[in-house]
Regions:
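Hydrophobic/aromatic residues within the transmembrane alpha-helices of Major Facilitator Superfamily
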Residues: 36, 48-49, 61-65, 72-76, ...
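Alpha-helical transmembrane segments of multipass membrane proteins
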Residues: 2, 10-15, 42-44, 48, ...
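Transmembrane-helix boundary motif in ABC transporter permease subunits
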Residues: 1-30
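Transmembrane alpha-helical segments of polytopic membrane transport and secretion proteins
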Residues: 168-182
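Glycine-rich helix-loop "coupling/hinge" segments at transmembrane-helix boundaries
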Residues: 47, 76, 121-162, 178-182
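Short cytoplasmic-facing helical segments at TM-TM junctions of multi-pass membrane proteins
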Residues: 68-110
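Transmembrane alpha-helices
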Residues: 62, 94-128, 150, 154, ...
Length: 182
């Protein structure tokens, strides 16, 4: 779900960075999605698709694509204009400008978006246990419903460790990319 969220979010971010109308349309949607409690996002998916893994997948994608889109758009919109102008002067096409200049320069910011997409996905995974998913989120839910401290804590700590590992890994990638683009 995180991979799909990141691909969807970064694609929309690229589009929004190059089209002010798309950016203006998506901004209130992103603001709403980020301020809405994560549990509330499940409601329309449960109403339309029922309870199950597919519903949880869609809810995770809907919740986690927002940071990927925001960070991608932000990274692409805040590039040094001199570098973009230099690339145009040497004859880069729009496609070359995007893939060979803009995205590599914006990659450290885009990696922050990936980091946040992973964190949002993991957060929604725990909430999605309420709609019948299996895995660590379900174990937390079982631990809560049966007042089983051990099961809940082990599952919660496991998810926290997974989040920390992904966080540190994406931060290391971002730092390497920042060194390359400087």
């Amino acid at each position: 779900a995180v991979i799909i969220s990141f691909i969807l979010g970064s694609s929309l971010g690229i589009w929004a960075a190059h089209n002010d109308k798309v950016s203006a349309f998506m901004r209130p949607i992103n603001d709403t999605m980020q301020t809405m409690p994560s549990f509330v996002i499940l409601i329309p998916f449960v109403m339309f698709f029922g309870i199950g893994e597919f519903t949880a997948l869609l809810a995770i994608i809907a919740y986690a694509f927002v940071p990927a889109m925001r960070y991608t758009e932000h990274g692409l919109r805040n590039l040094p204009e001199t570098v973009i102008e230099a690339a145009r002067m040497i004859g880069c096409s729009q496609t070359q400008l995007l893939w060979k200049v803009k995205i590599p320069l914006a990659m450290p910011v885009i990696m922050l978006g990936l980091n946040q997409t992973i964190m949002f996905g993991l957060a929604m995974l725990v909430i999605a246990a309420l709609v019948g998913t299996t895995g660590l989120g379900q174990l937390i839910y079982i631990g809560l419903s049966k007042a089983d401290f051990g099961t809940g804590m082990i599952s919660g700590v496991s998810i926290a460790l997974i989040a920390i590992i992904f966080d540190r890994t994406t931060q290391a990638w971002r730092i390497k990319l920042e060194k390359k683009t400087q």
